[in-house]
Amino acid sequence: MIGSRFIEGGGYKGLEKNTKSTLKNIINNLNNSEDSALAVYLSILFNNLLKFILSTNIRDLTSGFIVGKKRFFSSEMFNGFEYGEYFVFVVMKLLKNNLNVREVGYYCKPRKFGKSKTSSSLFRLIRLSYPYLKIAYKSRKELNDS
């Protein structure tokens, strides 16, 4: 089970799926936080790109929140990755093994304190996206070959 920001019951830093979030409310929530509106927008776009590359219905491939029975996971699924791209690998391994992967909504609140490691700059966002894209293309090839 994946915690997803992009399905019913989930939300993302000012944008709540179960409410009628106005653009004004979203911008206000982000302005009163330590989050970048650009990072939020790019995250949504990036998840859609990953979804397209992988031809999957999973909507939040950068969530990082996953729960399941221990027997379905191995340490190799989490080792040897640069940042959060392990999550794409884990989800695709589970799907390749014909396991039922479901998403449940969770709300990622706007950051009130501290700085994001991910969105400190546009360059960093772009640099961190490369390993995700690499593992997505590799996973797609593995799924097509099986």
PLM region spans:
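Residue-level signal for the nucleotide or nucleotide-sugar donor/cofactor binding architecture
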Residues: 82-85, 120
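Post-His helix in hydrolase/transferase enzymes
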Residues: 120-128
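A general structural signal for well-ordered alpha-helical segments in protein cores
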Residues: 42-47, 87-91, 101, 129-130
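Terminal low-complexity segments of carbohydrate-biosynthetic enzymes
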Residues: 72, 98, 127-146
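Acceptor/aglycone-binding surface of glycosyltransferases and processive sugar-polymer synthases
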Residues: 1-75, 113-120
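Conserved glycosyltransferase catalytic-site signature
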Residues: 61, 65-66, 84-91
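Catalytic donor-sugar/metal-binding loop of nucleotide-sugar-dependent glycosyltransferases
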Residues: 56-57, 78-82, 91-109
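Residues at helix-coil transition
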Residues: 51-55, 96, 138
